[in-house]
């Protein structure tokens, strides 16, 4: 993983060793303590940088892919596609991403900025629609491959090899519980396995959207928490690794993501809000008194400026206009003071 004290071989060498920080204001008065791993500080901006690089490296090692020859195709809610696009650009691969049209405009723009081609699918079909489209494209494009994040064992493996050890080292082995949103299930599976090998007492909790709580035995449905709640149980997810599932409504995740930015200075995306909301629920339990709960901020809020996360803020920002000093001072509640020209 990334060595921040030397020059990287290429951009992919900068992945990992992301920082951790305590949540302070939002946990005030709660029995437990919460810390977050800031995964949006990976070079392409999300936790998925880890699996994008790992899956491609494994395919290169076994000769499945060749730079400049193989076309990479990947169905994604956005972040894995961006991670693959970033690694593909660094290593010289053509990359095609299929994703539901409901994903944010920033994701489409980022994918194209990295040189990838984007194919949108019916949002009503969720991730299954994107997966079906990717499979159809693979059948028709010679020399193409799907790295298949939902099925690829290198997905949880890289979290077992990197994210888990980083959390253990950064917490000096004092982590008591981890809680992660389930998209592919790679993070919770890999991190959970590693930490429970170090300390079988570490508790693991999953997070899913209230509106699409399939891990809780409910039907799949539309929701706004991009990156989790794929609508099915992925093959790489170890459902025995977690003891319970915490359901977070999209609206709660959005509010928490907003609070994270203006109360903690952490600009996370909607799934970051879901993770922290779940972690705070755990921290509020009496049995969590004095315990350290760890979660992650999977991606940055800048990736969601056109999403429901920032609708009100975006509209307010776009409505700003050039005004006089007096008008600005009145807006800033300084109308009782003399105006100095």
Swiss-Prot record:
In Gene Ontology terms, what is a biological process of this protein?
A: cysteine biosynthetic process from serine
UniProt keyword rRNA-binding present: no
From the UniProt record, give the pathway where this protein acts: Amino-acid biosynthesis; L-cysteine biosynthesis; L-cysteine from L-serine: step 2/2
Per its UniProt record, what InterPro entries does this chain match?
Cys_synth (IPR005856), Cys_Synth/Cystath_Beta-Synth (IPR050214), CysK (IPR005859), P-phosphate_BS (IPR001216), TrpB-like_PALP (IPR001926), TrpB-like_PALP_sf (IPR036052)
Name its co-factor(s).
pyridoxal 5'-phosphate
Could you say what the effect of mutating residue 229 to E is?
In mr33; susceptible to high levels of hydrogen sulfide
- Quick one: a GO cellular component term? cytoplasm
- Name the UniProt key words of this record, in alphabetical order: Amino-acid biosynthesis, Cysteine biosynthesis, Pyridoxal phosphate, Transferase
A Pfam family that this protein carries is: PALP
Tissue expression: Expressed in AVM sensory neuron, BDU interneurons, pharyngeal I1 interneurons and M2 motor neurons.
Superkingdom per UniProt: Eukaryota
Mutation: residue 272 to F; reported impact is: In mr29; susceptible to high levels of hydrogen sulfide
Task: Provide the effect of residue 295 to I.
Answer: In mr39; susceptible to high levels of hydrogen sulfide
In the record, the effect of residue 75 to L is given as: In n5537; severe loss of protein stability
Task: Tell me what reaction this enzyme catalyses.
Answer: O-acetyl-L-serine + hydrogen sulfide = L-cysteine + acetate
- Top EC class per UniProt? transferase
Which residues of the sequence carry a binding annotation for pyridoxal 5'-phosphate? 79, 183-187, 271
What is the similarity comment for this entry? Belongs to the cysteine synthase/cystathionine beta-synthase family.
What this protein is reported to do is described as: Catalyzes the formation of cysteine and acetate from O-acetylserine and hydrogen sulfide. By metabolizing hydrogen sulfide produced by cysl-2-mediated cyanide assimilation, mediates resistance to P.aeruginosa infection. Mediates survival in high levels of hydrogen sulfide. By sequestering egl-9, which in turn promotes hif-1-mediated transcription, regulates behavioral responses to hypoxia.
Q: How does it assemble?
A: Homodimer. Interacts with egl-9 (via C-terminus); the interaction is enhanced by hydrogen disulfide and activates hif-1-mediated transcription.
- What this protein is called in its record is Cysteine synthase 1
The upper taxonomy is: Eukaryota, Metazoa, Ecdysozoa, Nematoda, Chromadorea
């Amino acid at each position: 993983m990334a060595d921040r004290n030397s020059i990287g071989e290429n951009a992919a060498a900068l992945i990992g060793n992301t920082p951790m920080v305590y949540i302070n204001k939002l946990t005030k008065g709660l029995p437990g303590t919460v810390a977050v791993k800031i995964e949006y500080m990976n070079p392409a901006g999300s936790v998925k940088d880890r699996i994008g690089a790992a899956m491609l490296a494994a395919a290169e090692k076994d000769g499945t892919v060749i730079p400049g020859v193989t076309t990479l195709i990947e169905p994604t809610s956005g972040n894995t596609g961006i991670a693959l696009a970033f690694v593909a650009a660094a290593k010289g691969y053509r990359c095609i991403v299929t994703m539901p049209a409901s994903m944010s405009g920033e994701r489409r723009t980022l994918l194209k900025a990295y040189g990838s081609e984007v194919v949108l699918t019916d949002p009503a079909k969720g991730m299954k629609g994107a997966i079906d489209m990717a499979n159809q494209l693979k059948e028709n494009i010679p020399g193409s491959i799907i790295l298949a994040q939902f099925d690829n064992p290198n997905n949880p493996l890289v979290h077992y090899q990197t994210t888990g050890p980083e959390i253990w080292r950064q917490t000096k082995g004092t982590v008591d519980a981890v809680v992660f949103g389930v998209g592919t299930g790679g993070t919770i599976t890999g991190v959970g396995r590693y930490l429970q090998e170090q300390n079988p007492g570490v508790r693991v909790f999953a997070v899913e959207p209230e509106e699409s709580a399939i891990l809780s035995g409910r039907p799949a449905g539309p929701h706004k928490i991009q990156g989790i709640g794929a609508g099915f149980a992925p093959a790489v997810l170890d459902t025995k690794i977690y003891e319970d599932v915490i359901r977070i409504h999209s609206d709660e995740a959005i509010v928490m993501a907003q609070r994270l930015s203006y109360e903690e200075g952490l600009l996370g995306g909607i799934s970051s809000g879901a993770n922290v909301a779940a972690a705070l629920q755990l921290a509020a339990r009496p049995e969590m008194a004095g315990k350290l709960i760890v979660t992650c901020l999977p991606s940055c809020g800048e990736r969601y400026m056109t999403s429901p996360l920032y609708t009100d803020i975006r509209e307010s920002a776009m409505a700003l206009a050039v005004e006089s000093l007096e008008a600005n001072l009145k807006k800033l509640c300084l109308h009782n003071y003399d105006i100095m020209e």
